[in-house]
C-alpha cells in the first residue's frame, strides 16, 4: 500500500475484499488473482494499523476517515477489530482525546465483537490514564452521556 493514499482509499480496498475473494473463488484456476487480492488486503490492513498506532489525530480529515471506518457497513468486522486494536496500542503510549472519543462511539457499535472490544479498551485506558480524562471536559461530558445511555438501556 502506497503511503500517499488516504483513509478513504484504504477503506475502499478493505471494503472490497469480500467481493474480491468471491470473484477469485469463481475462477479456481487463477491462483495469481487470489494471491494478489490477499496481498493487497494484508498490506492495506497493515498500513492502516501502523499509521493509526503511530499518529495523533491532529486534523479533521483523519478523524472523519476514522468515523467512516466505524460506520462502514461493508468493512469486514475483523478489519474493524484490527483498527480498534491499533487505537488501543496508540492510547496506551500517548493519550489522544479524539481516539478515546472514537472508542466511546465504537462501544455503541451494532457488532458485539467491536463494542465489547471497545469497552475493554476503554477500561484499560481509564486505568492507565486515569488522571488525564478530567483535563478534557468535553470528553468527560461524552463519557457521562455514554454511561447514562448504557444505564438506561440496562434498566429497560
Model-derived features with residue positions:
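Eukaryote-biased recognition of long, low-complexity, charge-rich segments
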Residues: 135-156
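Alpha-helical solenoid scaffolds in large eukaryotic transport, assembly, and signaling factors
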Residues: 5-109, 114-115, 121-135
Amino acid at each position: 500500500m502506497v503511503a500517499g493514499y488516504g483513509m478513504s482509499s484504504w477503506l475502499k480496498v478493505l471494503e472490497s475484499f469480500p467481493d474480491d475473494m468471491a470473484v477469485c473463488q469463481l475462477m479456481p484456476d487463477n491462483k495469481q488473482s487470489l494471491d494478489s487480492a490477499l496481498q493487497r488486503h494484508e498490506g492495506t490492513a497493515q498500513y492502516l494499523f501502523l499509521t493509526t498506532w503511530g499518529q495523533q489525530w491532529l486534523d479533521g480529515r483523519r478523524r472523519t476517515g476514522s468515523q467512516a471506518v466505524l460506520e462502514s457497513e461493508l468493512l469486514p468486522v475483523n478489519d474493524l477489530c484490527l483498527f480498534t486494536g491499533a487505537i488501543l496500542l496508540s492510547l496506551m503510549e500517548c493519550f489522544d482525546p479524539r481516539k478515546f472519543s472514537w472508542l466511546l462511539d465504537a462501544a455503541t457499535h451494532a457488532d458485539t465483537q467491536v463494542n465489547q472490544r471497545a469497552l475493554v479498551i476503554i477500561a484499560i485506558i481509564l486505568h492507565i490514564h486515569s488522571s488525564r480524562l478530567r483535563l478534557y471536559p468535553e470528553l468527560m461530558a461524552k463519557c457521562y452521556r455514554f454511561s447514562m445511555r448504557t444505564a438506561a438501556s440496562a434498566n429497560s
